[in-house]
């Protein structure tokens, strides 16, 4: 992470990125690669960025950053500047992907696979109703990403 921080100071600040909290996902091994998987609803501002780019980053903040989590999980980057609002300090990798100085751990990832969750594929209809019935929003899109780089404090 420190290498990325030093590099960021030499580079132009990128002006278009977003951050959000994501509770649904995991890390594992697939297709002989270290992977992560995340689920994002199409209504989210972050979804636009995921669709436009081949890479994404996952940053893990500690408990001391609860206020940052609260803002990033409740407000949209369409309406506020989350970096300004939270005090997050963006740093950029050599590939130009954004990480945050406050993160204890960050994963730089390349998209491998993406597909929408489909109602007809649910084997457990209770989960379908619980998470997608009523006013919950659209069906998530699942992204499987290869973990290319790991940065830690």
Cite the ranges covered by each PLM segment.
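Single conserved hydrophobic/aromatic residue that forms the stacking wall/gate
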Residues: 1-9, 13
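Short beta-strand/strand-turn micro-motif
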Residues: 15-23, 107-109, 145
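A short mixed-secondary-structure module that forms the rim of ligand-binding clefts
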Residues: 20-73, 82
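Conserved, well-structured core segments that form or line functional sites
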Residues: 79-82, 97, 104, 113-114
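Short, structured beta-strand/loop micro-motifs enriched in basic residues and often containing a Trp
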Residues: 82-91
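Exposed beta-sheet edge/beta-hairpin loop segments within beta-rich domains
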Residues: 93-103, 131-136
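Flexible glycine-rich active-site/ligand-binding loops centered on an Asp-His dyad
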Residues: 111-153
């Amino acid at each position: 992470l420190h290498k990325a921080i030093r590099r960021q100071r030499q580079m132009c600040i990128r002006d278009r990125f977003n951050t959000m909290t994501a509770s649904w996902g995991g890390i594992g091994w697939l297709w002989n690669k270290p992977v992560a998987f995340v689920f994002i609803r199409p209504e989210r501002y972050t979804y636009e960025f995921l669709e436009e780019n081949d890479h994404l980053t996952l940053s893990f903040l500690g408990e001391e950053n609860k206020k940052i989590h609260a803002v990033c999980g409740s407000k949209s980057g369409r309406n506020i500047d989350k970096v300004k609002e939270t005090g997050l300090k963006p740093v950029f990798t050599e590939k130009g992907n954004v990480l945050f100085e406050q993160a204890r751990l960050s994963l730089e990832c390349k998209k491998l696979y993406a597909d929408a969750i489909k109602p007809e594929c649910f084997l457990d209809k209770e989960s379908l109703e619980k998470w997608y019935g009523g006013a919950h929003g659209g069906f998530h899109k699942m992204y499987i990403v290869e973990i290319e780089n790991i940065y830690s404090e």
